[in-house]
């Protein structure tokens, strides 16, 4: 009898662990039950509505600011980590890995976006891929007083009782705050976060980032590619689940015109195999705002991107700009070509200082695949050969003294 009970419990635990869970609906109930928080939320939603109307009323949708990429300051917090320097170093790398994933997912430069083929898009005739055109960047300057983080260090905190278990902290207002801890689900976020209040996106410790992770923070199972944060940050930028309240009713909508009405999907269903609520339509199971596995979600829609852009416009004045270093920095006479390429490309620019030049290339998981230091001869002009790497998106970090820039390349 004991054996049978133990077996049942193990099966239950395994089954539960296979289903994506998100507590954002519970988070919203807490907000709506607090009169002050509710009014703040409604005020911000009203502002969002104005911004959304502006975008939707533009005759030429390409006039939306697509040429200038907006930088968004991020701070990441590990409340339960001690001060071990090795752990800190590993977690900072894991944080950057997760930031790189966000930047790829929100800008449609993720390598698996190639799965959206003409054959797949034909199944969803009114749906196009969307890009928010933003850059999430770890803050490095003017950190909040008393945090112990010096200028030049990234905004990653360790082992402090950040928020005292709450879900916002005014000390960290002006940032997108990500808290990595035991979340009671894969993660959660308010539906429309407020940087002014220090709102947070909470992520469970075992679904943060990708790869081998760090001690106590190893990405696990079907949610090991960092897409949980893409999902939850979608909520922060005012996106609901594609399946809304998970009912096929006329009133059930995510307020996005190009996501078919549907019920939620889990696991990794074959593309086009899940029927939508409207006859002839299929559920957009590969969308970040569904409940499918990390490996089986890879896109936002153009309608979702417009909605997120409107929300960004509504909160952009709340985001601090003085916490990012070299916001618009670019080396003089900089060129990187060809891009896309087959693994060989040329970099040229005029260095800012007489110091050495370091080139580091990371893959989309944050793995360092190239690292070389060059002597400075007054004009940098080098061809890099990465012919043994597989196709996909890579990030080229170029540093000369305190000057640093990052460029994204696509290897075909």
Cite the ranges covered by each PLM segment.
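N-terminal zymogen propeptides
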Residues: 18-69, 106
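C-terminal outer-membrane/trafficking sorting elements
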Residues: 329-337, 341-412
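Fold-level signature of zinc-dependent metallopeptidase catalytic domains
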Residues: 55-106, 181
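Hydrophobic h-region of N-terminal signal peptides that target proteins for export
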Residues: 8-17
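Stable alpha-helical elements in mature extracytoplasmic
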Residues: 91, 95-98, 225-229, 301-307, ...
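Metzincin-family zinc-dependent endopeptidase catalytic domain
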Residues: 97-269
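Sec-dependent signal peptide recognition
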Residues: 2-8, 391
